[in-house]
Amino acid sequence: MPKFTTNKEIAKLLRSISAVYAIKGGNYFQMIAYDRAADNVEHSTSELGDLWQDGKLGTVPGLGKSIQAYLDELFKTGRVGHFESLKKGMPAGMFELLSIPGMGPKTAYKLAKILKIKDIGDLELKAKAGKIRDLPGFGAKSEQDILASINETRSRTDRVILPFAYETAQRVLDYLKKCKDVERAEPLGSLRRMVATIGDIDIAGASKSPQEVIDYFIKFKEISRIIDKGSRKSSVLLTNGMQVDLLVGKPQAFGALLQHFTGSKNHNIHLREIAQKKDISVSDYGITVKGKLKEFKTEGNFYGFLGMDYIEPELREDTGEIEAATTHKLPDLIKLADIKGDIHIHSNYPIEPSHDLGKDSFEVLIKEAKHLGYEYMGLSDHSPGNSTHSEKQIVDLIQKRTYKIEQLKSSHKDIRILNLLEIDILANNKLSVPDVGLELLDGAIAGIHSSHRQDKKTQTKRILTAINSPYVQVISHPTGRLLGSREAYELDWPIIFKECVKNKTLLEINAWPNRLDLPDTLVKEAIGSGVNLIISSDSHAVEHLGNLQYGVSVARRGWAQKKDIANTLPWLEFKKWFNV
């Protein structure tokens, strides 16, 4: 197999083909298919090259047989003849511009074609020189918007989304734990604190034989290059592009090491200040009292020596957790086991949705929800496309789907099924489904899926439209952020929180890998304002249901307890949020 590309590069290639179809006026569903395939490839926790070698490309949602065949050609030869034919005649520079937030294919094509743009730097120079504003369909404002978007692109880092780093780290940890010399192995840093994006993966091991552990570690099959190797430390680069740093410490002092390298920096600075006032010092080796080092096997003992309760890693950001630990007022954080159901699940039911269709049938999803031990679940496909259907057509499609779901409710008495839809909050402050259609449902999840660049006042008004609707129970992915590609839009959060409480509307913590939205900081603010939250997987395939754990991590970072999350309630209490 030629050494081709990471998932990110393959996703970029697939998006370029979608762009070509958009410019050439190709089949709308071809465009959607390639966009969806790109999204699923980019957010896959397994490298596509590895899946291809194992004959498992078909396990990635959205990879139809034709795309699989093209990828097979890519991995075998390093090129795809069909893709090269499609791109013939297209200005090469346009494909680089597609990475700019808000830059659609037709705009990228027009700029690259007319101004002979070669890359993003070239576009920036032309924009600063005022060359864009005089083009047909552009103006001074659009020129400034392009410059702002270029700056946004440059501000991005090489950090990866939490689920990708987490599952990569789990493979390394599983390998390390098979070593007879390893007593414990744990992640460190931002990964252990479950931050939404991660840089390098840091791991700590406890062992009396550190050299043997290092020698074992560097034989991990996913390593592409050994960066550094010492007697206690080693850094390697994996085939998926992630760097993993391993540090091996003494078992009897592992608690202090784990605490120190978990961070955060601000949390540790605060601990150090407290220690100094007690005339002691803290380090990754332990706590020094009157010149004598005291070692700690566990973090619990480390914090206890400082007069504090154990602080969960997700809370260690110096946002009040140290004070709470000192006064024994830390929250009892929500756990994955507390979740009783998942209501944001997309299927492959042919409702002709406004956005991407799910991969699996109602029946497959119901079976997996039962396997997970859920009391209830929501089938919540995107509503029919508002721009491609009349109101009557939308209602007819909802009626047919409702009939199907009612049949499923009758045949699956051991799990409660909610007939929901995820509807669009349109740019004109209307919902994408008429009231007569919404009345057929058990409830609705509403979110913004277009016009993300409207100003704070306008976006807030759109969200309030949904919150004030008697048919909407949940606001999905409230900030609209896409980690690494789109910033959250500005909203007037105090007003939104107030209206959510008043209207008994739930704000979602969306666990989709590149959303993790509501962010943890807003989770904490929402809870403080009395808002109830719900954690959802937003799954588009049966295997995505497991993403819910990342939503739980976001909730924990936001200090959420079981009582703050609606879907920890048993069915008889939970159903009161909906029209059942």
Regions found by a protein language model. Give the residues of each.
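Charged, compositionally biased N-terminal leader segments and the immediate start
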Residues: 1-26
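Charged catalytic cores and adjacent phosphate/nucleic-acid-binding surfaces used
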Residues: 2-3, 194-339, 343-349, 360-373, ...
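Accessory alpha-helical DNA-binding modules that contact the DNA backbone or grooves
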Residues: 4, 28-234, 241, 255-256, ...
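A short small-residue
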Residues: 14-20, 151-153, 380-386
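Alpha-helix C-capping/helix-to-loop hinge sites
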Residues: 17-24, 44, 153-156, 451
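Two-metal-ion RNase H-like nuclease active-site motif
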Residues: 185-187, 341-345, 422
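Core AdoMet radical
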Residues: 378-379, 421-422
